[in-house]
Amino acid sequence: MAYVDGVFRHCNLTIEGGVIADIGFLPDSDNVNGDNGTIVFPGFTDVHVHLREPGFSYKETIRTGTRAAAHGGCTTVCAMPNLSPAPDCREHLERELDAIRRDACIRVIPYGTITMAQQGRTLSDMENMAADDAGFSDDGR
């Protein structure tokens, strides 16, 4: 079964190189898996992960966290901002984005902080970070 156009439908899937190449009623093939209970998903998004880099790589790194997420079926994760330095301005966000570009094996969208250093006093520079953030949070402080 596949979820197509808002409904579940019985169908055949052609998967080439790990990607769904066709959905429909297909001719017989030597390379067919029967109804073996396999479930195929296009990929999940986890909107609340703690990759902890930069600053706390002894707890988790972008490399290990994204590999674990990929193994669990995630193709995108949104990383919480409890880092050091906290992504509360463009410069600090760029440090995190550089590490993401270098080490992530899946798409990572970071959160920026709501307040400077997640202290709950002064608003962060959200305007200059918004284009590259999933949103803003002071989670994990």
Task: Cite the ranges covered by each PLM segment.
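N-terminal metal-binding scaffold of metallo-dependent hydrolase/deaminase domains
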Residues: 1-29
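A short acidic, often aromatic-flanked loop/helix-cap motif at beta-alpha or helix-coil junctions
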Residues: 29, 40, 116-118
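Short coil/turn connectors at secondary-structure junctions
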Residues: 27-29, 35-36, 72-75, 103-107, ...
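Fold-independent oxyanion-binding glycine-rich loops
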Residues: 5, 23, 35-36, 43-47, ...
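Metal-associated gating/positioning segment near the N- to mid-region
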Residues: 36-103
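Histidine/acidic-residue-rich, glycine-tolerant segments that coordinate divalent metal ions
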Residues: 83-95, 99-141
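Divalent metal-coordination and catalytic microenvironments
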Residues: 13, 18, 37, 48, ...
